[in-house]
Amino acid sequence: MPETSEHTSGSRELTEGSAGPVGEVAAGPATAREATGRIPAPVLAVAAMFTVQLGVAWSTSLFEPLGVAGATSLRLLVAAAVLLVIARPSLAGRTPRQLATVALLGLASGGMTLLFAASIQRIPMGVTSTIEFLGPLGVALASSRRLSHAGWAALAGLGVVLLCLADDGLNGADGLDTVGLALAGAAALCWAVYIVFTRRVGQVFDGFQGLAVSISVAAVAVLPVGGASAWHGLVDSDRTLWLLAQGVGVALLFPVATYMLEMTALRRLSSRVFGVLTSLEPGVAVLIGFLVLGQSLAPVQLAGLGCVVLASIAATLGDRGEE
């Protein structure tokens, strides 16, 4: 696959030879392969999108008792522990450059996770997800040599403008919270950085190993910001076990289940098909935000979301045509 098209899909793993945030589409545990082997690959890809958004929506229930940073820290710590047990990565023989690359991927992952969580506390989840999606879309468009992609970039920009045209924000606020929008934009930048290092890490770590290491770095990076909040929230609560159970459940949904589903789907789908499917993720975010959190978008905002999704699909199809 040409270098110019590897980042087009906008998913957490953007190449046919990659999976999760770490690149390799290596086989996961045998039990996971057996459990998903008979499920159509497109269903797995769509299921992965739902696990992301359901996990994010569920995590909002932890914001009040643990704080946004605390809830994020707990989720990443649990996910890192689970993935380390599954992958059992070894750092022996890695060069300083390889370790720095996976560390940067982990920092981008931690930043993206924390910023996204902070954003959805202030603006609807569908808006945050759509703005964040500009990160991978921007990488795809920037790496393309096709003149038509300038038009898709303009369409995506129009979509963001339409998304911001809201009369009401969360909790009765007048319009969308500007800090929330800025946080979503910062999350998009983190996702773009995260994508750049995806393939590099996948070239030196097999299977789930790179994922386990990068998520562990993310957990350590967020710990100084959210560790104390999570600890005090758990210790001071009379529902400590329930909060811990929720944290485990959220982490198992995203990132653990998400990446396993995506890795399996990518082993059986072309990157072109996978890219088109994952371009629908902002729409899934709007649906989950409505069903789980009771959030709705104005018609003009839905039109903006449609512009971003259309730009992503068009960029994906255009790039695959260059292969």
PLM region descriptions:
Residues 46-58, 86, 103-118, 161-162, ...:
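Hydrophobic alpha-helical transmembrane segments of multi-pass membrane transport proteins
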Residues 74, 105, 131, 151, ...:
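Hydrophobic core positions of alpha-helical segments in small-molecule transporters
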Residues 40-44, 70-85, 149-158, 179-186, ...:
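Hydrophobic alpha-helical transmembrane segments of multi-pass integral membrane proteins
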Residues 83, 134, 148-169, 288-290, ...:
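Hydrophobic transmembrane alpha-helices of multi-pass small-molecule transport proteins
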Residues 1-70, 104-107, 111-115, 158, ...:
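Glycine-/small-residue-enriched transmembrane alpha-helix faces in small-molecule transporters
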Residues 2-6, 12, 16, 20, ...:
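C-terminal-most transmembrane helix of multi-pass membrane proteins
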Residues 70-78, 117-147, 187, 271-290:
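Specific alpha-helical transmembrane segments that line the substrate/conduction pathway
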Residues 62, 71, 75, 119, ...:
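Hydrophobic/aromatic residues within transmembrane alpha-helices
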